[in-house]
Amino acid sequence: MKKTAVLNAQLSGVIASLGHTDGLTICDAGLPIPSEQQCVDLALTKGIPSFLSTLEVVLTELFVERILLAEEIKQANPTIEQQLLEMINKLAQTQGRQIEIEYVVHSEFKQRSNQAKAVVRTGECSPYANVILYSGVPF
């Protein structure tokens, strides 16, 4: 049995397959996901798993160079935004490199999410709890 943080085989495989600059979207239960896009659907019920708990586990295995958020999260979900930014700042310290943070309007976020290599759907049911993580290289 694997002893690293991600036990879900499909999610582990997606993370392992990411190359430099590939995007991985982690989203709430409501973000539209095209049928042709690879989706790791972890949603069990409302709130399980949460967006932040899923993000926390993914960040243990992914080297991140930048992230993308919807601008609307600042007003509609500031608590989630603040906790997410704290996690990203902690990760940047661990990685020894700054992580670029970019905001776009939600309609642009959805278009960019459609270009991600895969989407991880959580059971989160709060507004704009979505992020695109762009893979970096640890060397």
Swiss-Prot record:
Q: Which GO terms describe its molecular function?
A: D-ribose pyranase activity; intramolecular lyase activity; monosaccharide binding
EC number of this enzyme? 5.4.99.62
Taxonomically, the superkingdom here is: Bacteria
Active-site residues are 20
| Compartment(s) of residence | Cytoplasm
Keywords linked to the UniProt accession:
Carbohydrate metabolism, Cytoplasm, Isomerase
Sorted alphabetically, the Gene Ontology BP terms of this entry are: D-ribose catabolic process
TM region(s), chain numbering: none
Show the catalytic activity. Answer: beta-D-ribopyranose = beta-D-ribofuranose
**Protein's pathway:** Carbohydrate metabolism; D-ribose degradation; D-ribose 5-phosphate from beta-D-ribopyranose: step 1/2
Q: Which residues bind substrate?
A: 28, 106, 128-130
Where this protein primarily resides, as one coarse class?
cytoplasm
Stated role:
Catalyzes the interconversion of beta-pyran and beta-furan forms of D-ribose.
Similarity-based family: Belongs to the RbsD / FucU family. RbsD subfamily.
HAMAP family, A to Z: D_rib_pyranase (MF_01661)
| Subunit | Homodecamer.
- The name of this protein is D-ribose pyranase
